[in-house]
Amino acid sequence: MAADEVAGGARKATKSKLFEFLVHGVRPGMPSGARMPHQGAPMGPPGSPYMGSPAVRPGLAPAGMEPARKRAAPPPGQSQAQSQGQPVPTAPARSRSAKRRKMADKILPQRIRELVPESQAYMDLLAFERKLDQTIMRKRVDIQEALKRPMKQKRKLRLYISNTFNPAKPDAEDSDGSIASWELRVEGKLLDDPSKQKRKFSSFFKSLVIELDKDLYGPDNHLVEWHRTPTTQETDGFQVKRPGDLSVRCTLLLMLDYQPPQFKLDPRLARLLGLHTQSRSAIVQALWQYVKTNRLQDSHDKEYINGDKYFQQIFDCPRLKFSEIPQRLTALLLPPDPIVINHVISVDPSDQKKTACYDIDVEVEEPLKGQMSSFLLSTANQQEISALDSKIHETIESINQLKIQRDFMLSFSRDPKGYVQDLLRSQSRDLKVMTDVAGNPEEERRAEFYHQPWSQEAVSRYFYCKIQQRRQELEQSLVVRNT
């Protein structure tokens, strides 16, 4: 559909421009040398400034951990959050967080925008994409609301009523040929139908009754009826065959299949509202419009309607609730009038005018409704748009990693010694957190650390714990020996 292609093409073009700007980093009018960092640059956190493992000072043992301080590794399949007792998010929560993360990852950080002023073009494209997505979403909601309402248009259905006469053949071998008979056909088609799909003739009607002359065919064989059922097979026309060699007057009663169902209004209500046959919702809406126009709604209690003389004659009460109107309308709504066509089945061979045409108004589905439905169900260009989104996220992540590497190199070039010391302190803190090591080994290896006031209390506590431990061991050994 044209609207679907336009919407999908606009989104795809916007995504492509976003990705091209991020990859190439050049916008019209930009100097050739001014480029954003290329995606092919190495990624990942900055490596260690030293090569190999650090040397061990003479006289010091290699750094290690006591077995009691080591933390047991979690079992296979258990995450670090589970091993630490933290709640693990469920699948829907992960999907929502991933969606929020993706939306946030498409925005360039402020520090990168300050570093590369040309990146404002990407932010402008991102804002345009957001507006485009919001516009498409609003249009989709409008289309969904429009599809909930009946969308009909008036068309002309031309009926062709024809008949053929088969005279009797005395020398015929079968009984059918020896008796004169006639055949009546009822067919039709839409005039100027733009749709390529031809609609069956019977689909326009709920019932069809052909009433023949009762004097010729008797009270039991003068009616031919067709009524729609849930299992009805649609057909392009109806035909009736009867024996006879006399012209027959017949009456065709055609009941249109209204969708949604329509009703004929009571004559008094029809004069009041100016409607003859309409759907129930249209009748209620017209009645409400009449109430508002004539200010019949109660000024104190909006739920009630104070009827005028016409209103009281129709509903037979001076005052009623608006919620009661649909129930009271049931007695005032009648089945719609059928289409009545009088036709003469002629058996005169000299009568050449045996086909009659009639044009009737029918309601058909708006062709735009099918296009609107296909637009809502269409998934065209979705895979390509998703692929471009993934590339944009990867490119933004690459730019962030390159910014981290640039900051590292820039800080190192400004103050190599201070930056290396800060880096070592940071890595030392991270190592202590990762290995769960308590204390500070660098301070603990110096003698001044043990001359502080807390050392005397620590020694007393240590010996007290050892004495208690030995006492328990001796008591257990004595109990075992006595038994």
Curated annotation (Swiss-Prot):
Classification via Gene3D superfamilies = SWIB/MDM2 domain
Low complexity compositional bias, start-end: 78-87
GO annotation, biological process: cardiac right ventricle formation; chromatin remodeling; muscle cell differentiation; nervous system development; neural retina development; nucleosome disassembly; positive regulation of cell differentiation; positive regulation of DNA-templated transcription
One of the record's GO molecular function terms: transcription coregulator activity
State where it is primarily located: nucleus
Q: In which tissues is it expressed?
A: Isoform 2 and isoform 1 are expressed in brain, heart, kidney, placenta, prostate, salivary gland, spleen, testis, thyroid, trachea and uterus. Isoform 1 is also expressed in skeletal muscle and adipose tissue.
Q: Tell where it localizes.
A: Nucleus
Region annotation Disordered: where it falls in the sequence? 26-102
Q: Which GO terms describe its cellular component?
A: brahma complex; chromatin; cytoplasm; nBAF complex; npBAF complex; nucleoplasm; nucleus; SWI/SNF complex
List of residues that carry N-acetylalanine: A2
Q: Name one Pfam family in it.
A: SWIB
List-wise, which residues carry Phosphoserine? S178
InterPro entries given in the database record: SMARCD3_SWIB_dom, SWIB_domain, SWIB_MDM2_dom_sf, SWIB_MDM2_domain
Which keywords belong to this entry?
Acetylation, Chromatin regulator, Neurogenesis, Nucleus, Phosphoprotein, Transcription, Transcription regulation
Q: Where is the SWIB/MDM2 domain?
A: 258-335
Give a short account of what the protein does. Answer: Involved in transcriptional activation and repression of select genes by chromatin remodeling (alteration of DNA-nucleosome topology). Component of SWI/SNF chromatin remodeling complexes that carry out key enzymatic activities, changing chromatin structure by altering DNA-histone contacts within a nucleosome in an ATP-dependent manner. Stimulates nuclear receptor mediated transcription. Belongs to the neural progenitors-specific chromatin remodeling complex (npBAF complex) and the neuron-specific chromatin remodeling complex (nBAF complex).
Which family does the entry's similarity section mention?
A: Belongs to the SMARCD family.
Q: How does it assemble?
A: Component of the multiprotein chromatin-remodeling complexes SWI/SNF: SWI/SNF-A (BAF), SWI/SNF-B (PBAF) and related complexes. The canonical complex contains a catalytic subunit (either SMARCA4/BRG1/BAF190A or SMARCA2/BRM/BAF190B) and at least SMARCE1, ACTL6A/BAF53, SMARCC1/BAF155, SMARCC2/BAF170, and SMARCB1/SNF5/BAF47. Other subunits specific to each of the complexes may also be present permitting several possible combinations developmentally and tissue specific.
The name under which this protein is listed is SWI/SNF-related matrix-associated actin-dependent regulator of chromatin subfamily D member 3
State the organism named in the record.
Homo sapiens
